[in-house]
Amino acid sequence: MAGVLRSVFQRPPGRLQTVKKGAESLIGTEWIRHKFTRSRIPDKVFQPRPEDHEKYGGDPQNPHKLHIVTRIRSTKRRPYWEKDTIKMLGLQKAHSPQIHKNIPSVNAKLKVVKHLIRIQPLKLPQGLPTEETMSSTCLKSTGELVVQWHLKPVEQEAKS
């Protein structure tokens, strides 16, 4: 290194500029080995397969409309794009369920972080809740959304 600096300072100013131009070309990132690179996942991985339905259950003719997504593994020491996907899905806190639509754009994001999350179908045994009953719903660990009916007090007739 000292020999390189000595040769730079002993040369005339015109030659110093050519050395600077050569140094600027080394600043580019073409020669750096990047630690993380996006994996090249083939498209056939994202296509539905009949054996998946047999393995995990479910009906391909009538798929469920909503997913319950829960993060079960940490994002420490994971690549930045997985952390960004977890943040987009709202799964920063572990073991807190989030509900997402079963649509291709969301499913593509879930495939990227499928090793960090658990996906369950949302079951609605009592049907979709209305706006009034939304506050009295309970999400069970089995994936059922139960509407808890509030009991109204029975009015007693006045005794005379």
Curated annotation (Swiss-Prot):
Residues 1-34 form a transit peptide. It is found in: Mitochondrion. Belongs to the universal ribosomal protein uL30 family. GO terms for cellular component: mitochondrial large ribosomal subunit; mitochondrion. Keywords: Mitochondrion, Ribonucleoprotein, Ribosomal protein, Transit peptide. GO terms for molecular function: structural constituent of ribosome. Residues 45-64 are annotated as: Disordered. This is Large ribosomal subunit protein uL30m. It comes from the Eukaryota. Component of the mitochondrial ribosome large subunit (39S) which comprises a 16S rRNA and about 50 distinct proteins. The keyword Transit peptide applies. The keyword Manganese does not apply. CDD domains: Ribosomal_L30. One of its GO terms (biological process) is translation.
